[in-house]
């Protein structure tokens, strides 16, 4: 199945972009972010995962206010949907959206969940170049348990 990304020279296999290079049901692409205010009063974490071989996209956003005190509060938002075949539509899951503004330099995270009392519009701006972590391969007997490469990057957050 062709998708809007097939117009770009980004293919990693001879197949359309919508088809993964692995038949592993656990194959995924994922974002994970966290941040805190300078006074450390507020901490948040966000994640968004695309599991194309399971046709699932999941996202979560968690915020902790006054952590480490008797008044600490935590609010969580979780969302899930059928994963779209077109990866161009994969970065919105329920009220959580991740937008790539400048590849490897700036990303926008928005959450619009008034029923949970959470709204945010945050932009991650890199402070360091992305670091490709060493490739991780774990096998038990003949079964591959994990075959992955991750990227880590430091930056600052702007917004509300």
PLM region spans:
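Targeting-peptide/extracellular-domain and disordered-appendage signature
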Residues: 1-160
């Amino acid at each position: 199945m062709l998708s809007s990304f097939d117009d770009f020279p980004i293919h990693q296999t001879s197949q359309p972009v919508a088809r993964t290079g692995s038949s592993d049901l656990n194959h995924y692409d994922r974002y994970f972010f966290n941040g805190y205010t300078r006074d450390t009063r507020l901490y948040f974490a966000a994640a968004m995962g695309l599991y194309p071989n399971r046709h699932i996209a999941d996202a979560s956003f968690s915020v902790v206010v006054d952590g480490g005190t008797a008044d600490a509060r935590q609010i969580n938002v979780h969302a899930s949907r059928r994963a779209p075949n077109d990866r161009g539509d994969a970065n919105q899951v329920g009220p959580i959206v991740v937008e790539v503004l400048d590849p490897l330099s700036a990303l926008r995270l928005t959450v619009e969940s008034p029923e949970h009392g959470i709204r945010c519009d945050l932009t991650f701006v890199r402070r360091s170049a992305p670091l490709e972590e060493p490739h991780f391969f774990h096998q038990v007997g003949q079964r591959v348990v994990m075959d992955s490469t991750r990227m880590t990057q430091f930056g600052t957050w702007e917004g509300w």
